[in-house]
Amino acid sequence: MGQYWKPVNLTKREFINPHKLKTGLKMVEQAFSADIAAAMVILLSVMPQRRGGGDMQNNPFIGRWAGDMVVFVGDYSIDADMPNSPLPFGTAYALTHGEDYTDATGVMHKAFTDVTDDVIEIMQANGMWNEDADKQAAF
């Protein structure tokens, strides 16, 4: 067994789904396989390209997470893991399942939005995504 992890933007309430990237959810599967989840976090977190760069086709989604509170959240996470979280941190992983979640105190939290397909579109436009591959390589 092991803990399952997903990249999450706590500010915008968005996440990346590693399964859509043909990789597992465990830390070792993401950290030592294809680096694809890390590539997506980089694409979302860089400062917007509108000031130049030119190494990728411009897309307004690039840099969408710049300056936001972005973390990898695990299914064993508890509130004490991140006391300055804008929401009870222990609920963050549950909010990546596409459904609203009611915590133990009866408070309902709105589900996070999956932005994986939006970032895959950027990667396809820049030759970084092979739909037929068993695993993806970031570069």
Residue ranges and their predicted role:
Residues K20-S33:
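Conserved, aromatic- and glycine-enriched, well-ordered alpha/beta core segments
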Residues Q30-F139:
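Low-complexity intrinsically disordered segments
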Residues M1-K22:
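Short, extreme N-terminal segment that most often corresponds to the first beta-strand
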